[in-house]
């Protein structure tokens, strides 16, 4: 049996766990940790991913796709390299409503690209949020000049969007094969 | 859709660049940053900065198809008579009288410009150049702002009574980058705001030195126990502002930088390529087929 993997990365609280939960056929094996109630993180949410998220999509008897979500807090970024190993491609999730996280998104993107030159897409997540920046604006804000890199609107709780993001990543992988 | 944020995380230059590249029309308002006492988490899930909410508007810029056409800033008198005076086209007395008359007659900037040109006070070119200068100076000011909330609203039109002078943003961005380079220089000179300061000699030597009010405020906090960052906070200064002052004090040999009590630990960035699996086309195609069929209802 063959297994392949994709990595879902992005800044703290950008929606990585949610994304994997929405499409995984198993309950996401998540290493969530409660955030201390009176800390700043907790204004955002009550739990954060500590080591990784882990989701699965079974294609057939001999092919399984694993989705790995990276932990959001930088103090756990020793995990990134391990997760990046052997990945087919990666998705950079960005909370489009939080410009304060764009710089980090850019830095994560760069780091992953340095780990492995695999194709990737950027998901402009939380497009349902009133303050969400448009994907076109995010492209400029994140300085993604390469037109071949797809910047896709996303709502991580909505399967339609999640499916589209993964499909676009797979199409990018095919395109890369064609160009080699 | 809104384009909201604050200048601490998305700079004026970045904003102008975005508006220029996307050929936007609309208005950009910069607000006073009001402290909430709350913190805002950056994307690393670790760094926190003060969370500011929008207070009263401090500046507004209008754009048409990516060009800057109008700017006003609360702290910069934008009356045409004052603008012409600042650029040397009117003297103080002329400016005062003209302004009085214009206000008495409830003249708009446009009407005033016309009558000034007709009366041969100034030329149309004078007016355009003066307004341009005023607009650009507002933008350069904004480029030094470091934490104010902003909001861009699409399609908002510039005030009809004002004289609109379209300015290509690219030149301003280039110039703005130069200004920011100055900041980078300062950051290189004073990279670590967690360092502390101490007097190079007896503080009484300051008596004969001319310092501005801001410098004095900083001097008042100099003590090996206070980090530069803490001083900035106490004086309500931005990082750049405190760096500028500390730099000047250092250059003048009045203060010395001393080691921070606790040096911030930095983990080296490990970035070596990891092994990569080259998948085969069949695998990717099977994945595509499978994912297309997934239709869970959440
Ligand atoms: N409105 C909206 N909320 C979302 C969306 N995606 C995620 N969220 C919410 O955003 C918060 C963070 O989502 P998570 O999936 O935990 O984010 P994460 O990236 O895994 O976070 P860390 O593991 O802490 O880095 C949660 O409250 C989610 O419910 C979205 O598309 N729209
Ligand atoms: Mg998570």
Question: Which residues are covered by each model-predicted region?
Answer:
Chain A
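Inter-motif core of Ras-like GTPase G domains
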Residues: 75-98, 111-115
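Conserved catalytic network of the ASCE P-loop NTPase/AAA+ motor domain
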Residues: 49, 58-61, 81-86, 112-116, ...
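A structural signal for isolated positions on well-ordered beta-strands in alpha/beta enzyme cores
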Residues: 7, 121-122, 150-152
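Conserved G1/Walker A P-loop phosphate-binding module
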Residues: 1-46, 55-58, 64-66
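Conserved C-terminal guanine-recognition region of P-loop GTPase G domains, centered on the G4
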Residues: 94-147
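Canonical P-loop GTPase G-domain recognition
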Residues: 128-180
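Switch II (G3) loop of P-loop NTPases
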Residues: 59-77
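Loop/turn-to-beta-strand initiation segments
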Residues: 62-65, 88-89, 118-121
